Curated annotation (Swiss-Prot):
Keyword Calcium among UniProt keywords: no
Gene Ontology CC: cytosol; ribonucleoprotein complex; ribosome
Annotated protein name in UniProt: Small ribosomal subunit protein eS17
UniProt record similarity statement: Belongs to the eukaryotic ribosomal protein eS17 family.
Lineage: Archaea, Methanobacteriati, Methanobacteriota, Methanomada group, Methanobacteria
GO-annotated molecular function: structural constituent of ribosome
Disulfide-bond pairs as recorded: none
Database matches in Pfam families: Ribosomal_S17e (PF00833)
Classification via InterPro entries: Ribosomal_eS17, Ribosomal_eS17_CS, Ribosomal_eS17_sf
GO biological process: translation
Keywords associated with the record: Ribonucleoprotein, Ribosomal protein
Organism this protein belongs to: Methanothermobacter thermautotrophicus (strain ATCC 29096 / DSM 1053 / JCM 10044 / NBRC 100330 / Delta H) (Methanobacterium thermoautotrophicum)
Designated gene of the protein: rps17e
PROSITE patterns: RIBOSOMAL_S17E
Entries under SUPFAM superfamilies matching the protein: Rps17e-like
Signal peptide: none
Length: 62
């Protein structure tokens, strides 16, 4: 069983991948810093959810 993410997290993550192609990697810590830099996410919890989802998408693309 996996984690279910809200449509907000999915939408923001996909938009960030499209607007910044090639910047995100399959490393969570790197993506966490990039999400903080590129977005105006207000909470650490939400930032980590978005970074984790981006990491998962990038890992599946490889």
């Amino acid at each position: 069983m996996g984690n279910i993410r809200t449509s907000f997290v999915k939408r923001i993550a996909k938009e960030m991948i499209e607007t910044h192609p090639g910047k995100f990697t399959d490393d969570f810590d790197t993506n966490k810093k990039l999400v903080e830099e590129f977005s105006t996410v207000s909470t650490k919890h939400l930032r980590n959810k978005i970074a984790g989802y981006i990491t998962r998408i990038i890992s599946q693309q490889k």
